[in-house]
Amino acid sequence: MLNRRAFTFASIGLAATASLRTTGARANEETMATTTTKSPFEITKTPEEWRKTLTPEQFYVLREHGTERAGTSPLDKTYAAGTYDCAGCELPLFSSETKFNSGTGWPSFYQPLDNAVANTVDKSLFMTRTEVHCRRCGGHLGHVFEDGPPPTGLRYCMNGVALKFIPKAAS
C-alpha cells in the first residue's frame, strides 16, 4: 500500500518530469519555427510545400527534427565515390572521401564540405547536443559528436533519409 511519503515523492517526480518534457518540447518548437518561418535560409517553403517534395520519412527528419531508426538506411553501407547531398534542396554536403564506418547504424563522416552545414544547440531528450542542419534549406541532418577519427576527431552522425547519394561520374 502506498504511504503518504511515497505518494509525495512520486508526485514530485512526475511533476518534474512533465516540466522538463514541456520545456524541451517548447525549445524544439522554437527551433522548428525558425526553420519554417522567419527563415534565414536561402530556400524556404511552407510545410505544405515541403510535404509535396519530400517523402513522409524525409519530412519527419528534415522538417520535424526526427531521427530514423539505426541501421535502416542503405547509405550507411554505401562506400562508392561521390557526394552526399541534402535530400531537401540537393546542396552537396559531404564527400565520400570523409565517410567512415562508425558502427552506429547511421552514415557518418568526419568532415562536411566547405560552407555546406551549420550547427545549433539541441537540448531535447534531457541532454545537450550539437544539431547539424543544411545551411541552405535548414533541413535537420543529424548531430555532430567529438568521438570521430583523425584528422578532425569529429563524427557527423547523419540520418540517411536526409541525404541523397550522387555517384561520381565515370572518367
Task: Label the predicted regions.
Residues 86, 134-137:
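Short cysteine-rich clusters marking metal-coordination/redox-active sites
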Residues 1-15:
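N-terminal secretory signal peptides and thylakoid transit peptides that target proteins
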Residues 62-79:
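N-terminal post-signal-peptidase region of extra-cytosolic proteins
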Residues 90, 138, 158-161:
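Cys/His-coordinated zinc-binding microdomains
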Residues 79-108:
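Mid-length scaffold segments of soluble, non-membrane domains
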Residues 95-96, 143-144, 166:
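Short, non-ligating residues that shape and space the ligands of small metal-coordination modules
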Residues 83, 131, 154:
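Residues immediately within or flanking Cys/His clusters that coordinate Zn2+
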Residues 22-58, 69:
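C-terminal segment of N-terminal export signals and the immediately downstream linker at the start
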